Amino acid sequence: MGRLTEAAAAGSGSRAAGWAGSPPTLLPLSPTSPRCAATMASSDEDGTNGGASEAGEDREAPGERRRLGVLATAWLTFYDIAMTAGWLVLAIAMVRFYMEKGTHRGLYKSIQKTLKFFQTFALLEIVHCLIGIVPTSVIVTGVQVSSRIFMVWLITHSIKPIQNEESVVLFLVAWTVTEITRYSFYTFSLLDHLPYFIKWARYNFFIILYPVGVAGELLTIYAALPHVKKTGMFSIRLPNKYNVSFDYYYFLLITMASYIPLFPQLYFHMLRQRRKVLHGEVIVEKDD
């Protein structure tokens, strides 16, 4: 039998989400990209890692917020405001750099400290899930946040020859717009005052940002391959006392291949969530 699942737009109660996606989170994948990489109604569009994500629950639901208590709500509000401000600072720095220099070369180096701080600070997303103040999957959140950390620390930070690649700008722009939208959405929802534009942006920007973020991440990893293969960085060769081998070059190839099944699945999932929230569509799901 079919199971009828209704999802009407929830105003301030809905949440949305790579690799990075982010999003969701990709996913997220980067831009796509939390509160835990899950559905657009619960997580990140970030896909993307580009910020993308999968399914989660509504953090801002009034009943859930009452259960959170004043302290947890105050902390989440502070956290979301701080993250919104941080990514705004990053956006302003990127615009100023390009206006002054007229080129993307040197951009990453000029903003890397801010990027590393706020993206690493997002590890608290996992803590929020672990202690239960955000009712979403620890695993899904961990995957999304870790994917962003991976891109920041193990790719662009560690492989300096690729820092001036245009693909780096692609995922940086996608991440930045996604995160400003996402965290401002969370903030206004917690304050019970969600402007329609923020809600609209949350459920529409990912349509472009998620593919852009994913493309930027993939192209950046691809650009890193020759350097990784030549230097053997992060690889473990046999023989060694642990009798273990690891090849970072092939790990990156596998990582890139993983985008093939994940990207369409997460992207179309987010499109369904968009229809639910913005248009109040009724989705009929068939039981297996």
Curated annotation (Swiss-Prot):
Q: Give the Enzyme Commission number.
A: 4.2.1.134
The record's account of how the chain is modified after translation: N-glycosylated.
Q: Which GO terms describe its molecular function?
A: 3-hydroxyacyl-CoA dehydratase activity; enzyme binding; hydroxyapatite binding; very-long-chain (3R)-3-hydroxyacyl-CoA dehydratase activity
> Which Gene Ontology cellular-component terms appear in the entry?
endoplasmic reticulum; endoplasmic reticulum membrane; membrane
Q: Where is the composition biased (Low complexity)?
A: 7-34
Using the UniProt annotation, give all residue ranges assigned to the region (Disordered).
Answer: 1-63
Q: Which residues lie on this side of the membrane: Cytoplasmic?
A: 1-75, 132-141, 181-203, 270-288
Instruction: Spell out the reaction equation it catalyses.
Output: a very-long-chain (3R)-3-hydroxyacyl-CoA = a very-long-chain (2E)-enoyl-CoA + H2O; (3R)-hydroxyhexadecanoyl-CoA = (2E)-hexadecenoyl-CoA + H2O; (3R)-hydroxyoctadecanoyl-CoA = (2E)-octadecenoyl-CoA + H2O; (3R)-hydroxyeicosanoyl-CoA = (2E)-eicosenoyl-CoA + H2O
Glycan attachment residues as annotated in the record? N243
Membrane-spanning intervals of the chain = 76-95, 115-131, 142-159, 166-180, 204-221, 252-269
Per the UniProt topology annotation, the Lumenal ranges are 96-114, 160-165, 222-251
Q: Where is the active site?
A: Y210, E217
InterPro entries, from UniProt? Tyr_Pase-like_PTPLA
Q: Which Pfam families match?
A: PTPLA
Q: Which residues carry this modification: Phosphoserine?
A: S22
According to its UniProt entry, one GO biological process term is:
very long-chain fatty acid biosynthetic process
Q: In which tissues does this protein get expressed?
A: Isoform 1 is highly expressed in the myocardium, and to a lesser extent in skeletal and smooth muscular tissues including those from stomach, jejunum, and bladder. Also detected in gingival fibroblasts, periodontal ligament cells, osteoblasts and cementoblasts. Isoform 2 is specifically expressed by cementoblasts but also detected in periodontal ligament cells, heart, liver and kidney (at protein level).
At the top of the EC hierarchy, this enzyme's class is lyase
**Pathway(s):** Lipid metabolism; fatty acid biosynthesis
Provide the alphabetized UniProt keywords: Developmental protein, Disease variant, Endoplasmic reticulum, Fatty acid biosynthesis, Fatty acid metabolism, Glycoprotein, Lipid biosynthesis, Lipid metabolism, Lyase, Membrane, Phosphoprotein, Transmembrane, Transmembrane helix
Family affiliation? Belongs to the very long-chain fatty acids dehydratase HACD family.
- What quaternary arrangement does the UniProt entry report? Interacts with TECR.
Disorder cited: Congenital myopathy 11: An autosomal recessive skeletal muscle disorder characterized clinically by severe hypotonia apparent at birth, motor delay, and walking difficulties. The course of the disease is non-progressive, and affected individuals achieve independent ambulation and tend to show improvement of muscle weakness throughout childhood and early adulthood.
In Swiss-Prot or TrEMBL terms, this protein is called: Very-long-chain (3R)-3-hydroxyacyl-CoA dehydratase 1
